[in-house]
Amino acid sequence: MPLSCQHFRKLLLLDEEAGPLEEELPRLADEGLNHRVAEDLNLQLPNVSIPWTHKVGNFTGLYSSTAPVFNPNWQTPSFPDIHLHQDIINKCEQLVGPLTVNEKRRLKLIMPARFYPNSTKYFPPDKGIKPYYPEHGVNHYFQARHYLHTLWKAGVLYKRETTRSASFCGSPYSWEQELQHGAEPFCHQPFGILPRASIGPAVPSQHKQSRLGLQSQQGHLARSHQGRSGSIWARVHSTSRRSFGVEPAGSGRNHNTASSSSSCLHQSAVRKAAYSHLSTFERHSSSGHAVELHGFPPSSAGSQSKGSVFPCWWLQFRDSEPCSDNCLSHIVNLLEDWGPCTEHGEHLIRIPRTPARVTGGVFLVDKNPHNSSESRLVVDFSQFSRGSTRVSWPKFAVPNLQSLTNLLSSNLSWLSLDVSAAFYHLPLHPAAMPHLLVGSSGLPRYVARLSSTSRNHHHQRGTMQNLHDFCSRNLFVSLMLLYKTFGRKLHLYSHPTIMGFRKIPMGVGLSPFLLAQFTSALCSVVRRAFPHCLAFSYMDDMVLGAKSVQHLESLYTAVTNFLLSLGIHLNPGKTKRWGYSLHFMGYVIGSWGTLPQDHIVQKIKQCFRKLPVNRPIDWKVCQRIVGLLGFAAPFTQCGYPALMPLYNCIHNRQAFTFSPTYKAFLRTQYLTLYPVARQRPGLCQVFADATPTGWGLALGPQRMRGTFVAPLPIHTAELLAACFARSRSGANIIGTDNSVVLSRKYTSFPWLLGCAANWILRGTSFVYVPSALNPADDPSRGRLGLYRPLLRLPFRPTTGRTSLYAVSPSVPSHLPVRVHFASPLHVAWRPP
């Protein structure tokens, strides 16, 4: 007779009528019983010939490509002028005094961030914008180009001007000013003595000694382009490369040093005029010497493709006869002035040799599942996560559920801050630009790649007879609709462009690490500045807690002003006030403990409604199901061990079939969720120990012992002893000398025992006691007459490695009757 859900729960000792634990529990460790139950629940059947189910409700396989939906009316989000202040350490020290070593180290990591992989693959610019939406290729191209242009205007991207120069918008950092054309003048060295930094050939005019400010950075740059003789920065821009800021021979280096920062900023303003006139002119620096500045030819971006006969593909249509009603010349003739072929930034800097290639592709998706009106740029730098160009990213601690509960479970009032475009706050060194390139090859190449006529363009590119090969009804209609949106920018976006990241991009594994370091250091500073409050962050999610709503509001004002003074942009509209139940990282955290948020509970209910019975489900779909159920597993009776059959099928890449009993068992598990409570400090009075043949307990002054029917593996025996100690004493702090029991991971034990032990030991805290000092060691070996003295073992709850580098205030047990506004610092609390 198949096992019913009720009998199964009884077997797992989840119901009250179970017999004595010392008899019932060891049976669950029996291998034969585990096999029989698995067969009864259909958990270990071999693969069957029934076709697999590849979709359960909204869940499809992790690797199945769900077609993204393109929205032709996507709005490109606006980005504020984000400029994180360079003297962030000084500003923090003004607030709290000297920073700790940990805080300083974290803040130095991101000023500027550095990314120098050993090897980088370069792809043709055709692959810059991914053809994710074949039906809307042209529309997607212009939307993506507009997004990139918006990021460039906001100072998030560099624009490659030549192989060795790039322009950008926004305020320059000091390391960029050192690399700025014109900021540091060249000077002749008549004796041909080279600065220490340069290894290249001796030439009369030389750059400043250290181009990057730090010698170590030159090593990075030199290594990133091995195989080419000489240092990159030591090469001099000849006149053919358009040198900026060249000073006449004979003038000493010291003349222009004082005015270097002012002259480079002044020059950036003057440069706009230079671009508009497209001519060479002279200006006088504050040292009185004439400084020569060369403008760019109009098609500097487009002219990189050798052999192009005509300056601009777009404007050629103006001089040609229309080939049909769908000819692009009709669109080009709509406007007299289409604007420049290329735009230049406010500042120009020298960069390492950067090819006209991309290292990752981009495409657009909905901003989030709840907002499909705005787009989000997805950058695919996956080359740095796989293959020969793989980079091993630094690891960082993510708070586990118990640590998070210990830290945040309290009766504080909470609010969460929203940092807008958090990743784009952290600046990247210009030397990282050649590794993080995005862009496009221009509209004609993109259209040619999408169309089947691309082979024609290879042979006769740029000639008049194939100009009209591009004309088609689809392209004409798309461009006419886009003309209403973008106007004369259609011309600008139709040209090729290569851009490199100036701020950290989201598609690189280094970025979450850097963001976590940055926000944790800031929260550490805030906690020390306001010791009567609690600040905590995970990535860009920052929460503030205070004893009362009034305190919280004044704290919010002070912290917001502090963050704004550092140049951090907050979204005041998205600030959420949670009251006493904090919503954070998918959890609801209150004084009673932690539970999953309601939308996750609803998803789980929906999942069980859609879950088919007696049908093999693809293991990739099982991954999705386990991902959802695993998030809420700590809140159920049996926890993760209940999901072990699913984990095993995923590990073996086999289909999984839910039997009615196993599905009903899981559903009852997730029907009632129990909060994970905050651990309390205390003294350990109960100890457990075991040998393969017997167990022993020390319950205060009392000693107990027992034997197993058959010898058991030592870890299993230790787990059983801990369960007996909990059920006999009811103590929630138990001392043990077994590391597996201490870890509270019961997934490697026999399945039935793991499920039962998880429920028995729920809410129990363990303290490590060495075997030699364990009072339960003698009883476990059958020696009841020997009494070792009970240890005074204190248990202190841990907050894990959650980047709490400053002293974190503990949480008051209750709200004070009256809040003293005079000086909240007098009631500062100490850490738990």
From Swiss-Prot:
Residues binding Mg(2+), per UniProt: 418, 540-541
Catalyses which reaction(s): DNA(n) + a 2'-deoxyribonucleoside 5'-triphosphate = DNA(n+1) + diphosphate; Endonucleolytic cleavage to 5'-phosphomonoester
GO MF terms held by the record: DNA binding; DNA-directed DNA polymerase activity; metal ion binding; RNA-directed DNA polymerase activity; RNA-DNA hybrid ribonuclease activity
Annotated spans, Spacer: 178-335
Reverse transcriptase domain span: 346-589
Site for Priming of reverse-transcription by covalently linking the first nucleotide of the (-)DNA, residues: 63
Region (Terminal protein domain (TP)): 1-177
Enzyme Commission number(s) from the entry: 2.7.7.7, 2.7.7.49, 3.1.26.4
UniProt remark on domains: Terminal protein domain (TP) is hepadnavirus-specific. Spacer domain is highly variable and separates the TP and RT domains. Polymerase/reverse-transcriptase domain (RT) and ribonuclease H domain (RH) are similar to retrovirus reverse transcriptase/RNase H. The polymerase/reverse transcriptase (RT) and ribonuclease H (RH) domains are structured in five subdomains: finger, palm, thumb, connection and RNase H. Within the palm subdomain, the 'primer grip' region is thought to be involved in the positioning of the primer terminus for accommodating the incoming nucleotide. The RH domain stabilizes the association of RT with primer-template.
Taxonomy, superkingdom: Viruses
Pfam families found in the cross-reference section: DNA_pol_viral_C, DNA_pol_viral_N, RVT_1
Biological role stated in the UniProt entry: Multifunctional enzyme that converts the viral RNA genome into dsDNA in viral cytoplasmic capsids. This enzyme displays a DNA polymerase activity that can copy either DNA or RNA templates, and a ribonuclease H (RNase H) activity that cleaves the RNA strand of RNA-DNA heteroduplexes in a partially processive 3'- to 5'-endonucleasic mode. Neo-synthesized pregenomic RNA (pgRNA) are encapsidated together with the P protein, and reverse-transcribed inside the nucleocapsid.
Reported regulation of activity: Activated by host HSP70 and HSP40 in vitro to be able to bind the epsilon loop of the pgRNA. Because deletion of the RNase H region renders the protein partly chaperone-independent, the chaperones may be needed indirectly to relieve occlusion of the RNA-binding site by this domain. Inhibited by several reverse-transcriptase inhibitors: Lamivudine, Adefovir and Entecavir.
Other remarks in the entry: Hepadnaviral virions contain probably just one P protein molecule per particle.
Disulfide bond residue pairs: none
Keywords, alphabetical: DNA replication, DNA-binding, DNA-directed DNA polymerase, Endonuclease, Host-virus interaction, Hydrolase, Inhibition of host innate immune response by virus, Inhibition of host RLR pathway by virus, Magnesium, Metal-binding, Multifunctional enzyme, Nuclease, Nucleotidyltransferase, RNA-directed DNA polymerase, Transferase, Viral immunoevasion
Family, as annotated: Belongs to the hepadnaviridae P protein family.
Residue span of region Polymerase/reverse transcriptase domain (RT): 336-679
Name of the protein: Protein P
Chain segments annotated as coiled-coil in the UniProt record: none
Region Disordered, residue ranges: 198-264
GO process annotations (BP): DNA replication; symbiont-mediated suppression of host innate immune response
Organism: Orangutan hepatitis B virus (isolate Somad)
